[in-house]
Regions:
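N-terminal Rossmann NAD(P)H-binding glycine-rich loop of SDR-like oxidoreductase domains
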Residues: 11, 19
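Conserved NAD(P)H cofactor-binding loop of Rossmann-fold oxidoreductase domains
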Residues: 81-86
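Substrate-binding pocket helix/loop in short-chain dehydrogenase/reductase
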Residues: 89-90, 97-99
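Active-site helix of classical SDR
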Residues: 113, 148-151
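Residue(s) in the substrate-gating loop at a strand-loop-helix junction
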Residues: 132
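Active-site-adjacent segment of SDR/Rossmann-fold oxidoreductases
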Residues: 140, 161-171
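C-terminal helical subdomain
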Residues: 168, 175-176, 191-229
Length: 229
């Protein structure tokens, strides 16, 4: 059965690996959303991948997403993978740092979901929100990541609330809190650190989870980590 899979934050790291992995199945129709679409040029020749410019750091996220989604009959899977990381001491965080972190990591995610839900209600779908171990309660926290980690904690809370609101529908919602994977974002947070898991390895797990986990779980906040970092 053909599946329409929307991947937000597809231009690099885990998101780009997800496009590679999920597009190998010709029955998957991939909608890749990214602020920087140039890095996705290698997928232009694939008939089952469509690429759209999409910026979460704007006031028009919901309307932009609705415009993109109007071209698909339904959405089977939405993977909210995009993220903004600011690594600064707490007292050096500007209001702009805080607003952008929450706009990209929380508000933009919620508005994207608002646009996607009408495309899921009839046949059902799986929303996978990507959070971080930094936002998972009770784990080790790191100085300099106050804006990032608190916003990712909000993503986990949003997942639980959304799951409750839509528990009587065909929509399933889950959240993966990722530990260290070798990505550009990890390098920004912990320069020089070598993660035990590659972006591709993490993407393989997320792809399988996105395709299958909705069959037996809903509203789950799941740590996916060997190290933090």
């Amino acid at each position: 059965m053909r599946k329409t899979i929307v991947i937000v934050g597809a231009s690099r790291g885990i998101g780009k690996e997800l496009v590679k992995i999920l597009s190998r199945d010709e029955n998957n129709s991939i909608v890749a959303l990214a602020r920087n679409t140039a890095s996705l040029a290698e997928f232009n020749h694939l008939a089952n991948v469509e690429i759209h410019a999409f910026d979460l750091n704007t006031d028009a996220v919901r309307t932009s997403a609705e415009t993109i989604f109007q071209h698909v009959s339904n959405i089977d899977i939405l993977i909210n993978n995009a993220g903004k990381l600011v690594n600064k001491p707490f007292l050096e965080l500007s209001k702009e740092d805080l607003e952008e972190s929450y706009q990209v990591n929380v508000i933009g995610v919620m508005e994207t979901v608002q646009a996607a839900i009408p495309k899921m209600l009839e046949v059902g779908g799986h929303i996978v929100n990507i959070s971080s171990m930094g936002g998972f309660q009770g784990t080790v926290k790191f100085a300099g990541l106050a804006a990032y980690s608190t916003s990712k904690a909000a993503v986990a809370s949003f997942t639980e609330l959304l799951a409750e609101e839509y528990k009587d529908t065909k929509i399933k919602v889950n959240c993966l809190c990722l530990g260290s994977a070798q990505t550009e974002m990890l390098e920004e947070a912990f320069p020089g650190f070598q993660a035990p898991v590659s972006a591709n390895q993490m993407a393989v797990y997320i792809a399988d989870f996105s395709l299958n986990a909705h069959q037996w779980m809903h509203g789950r906040i799941i740590p996916v980590s060997l190290t933090t970092p």
